[in-house]
Amino acid sequence: MARTKQTARISTGGKAPRKQLAPKAARQSAPATGGVKKPHRFRPGTVALRDIRKYQKSTEILIRKLPFQRLVREIAQDFKTDLRFQSSAVAALQEAAEAYLVGLFEDTNLCAIHAKRVTIMPKEIQLARRIRGERARGE
């Protein structure tokens, strides 16, 4: 479709007539058809950025203690049965595991940014581990 020039139009002048509002008593008695208010929705990415700032400020552990403890005991079973753990030992393992994961995700994010993306993918995690010199499982 070809573009055409806009021509000037003559204005009809004046303002459009306003609708008359119903009297206050009549408005209150009328049933509200759209009375259900929609929940507020943030724009995509806003909540994610808020969460990032929140977790970067905080220092508390993010993995739940009992599931982590069960995982540690399950892995330890492969090496020796009937092992017992002090609670401080499990806490130290959890602190170290979270520090490792945070560092890995930082490096992974840098790899994704280098690829001109903001979404991390498994290939970035693999690249970050390879650059760090870590061996993959099964090698």
From Swiss-Prot:
**Which residues does the record list as Phosphoserine (modified residue)?**
11, 29
Compositionally biased tracts (Polar residues): 1-10
* Post-translational modification Phosphothreonine, affected residues: 12
SMART domains documented for this protein = H3 (SM00428)
Report the locations given in the UniProt record: Nucleus; Chromosome
Q: Which residues carry this modification: N6-acetyllysine?
A: 15, 19, 24
Name assigned to this protein: Histone H3-like 5
Organism expressing this protein natively? Arabidopsis thaliana (Mouse-ear cress)
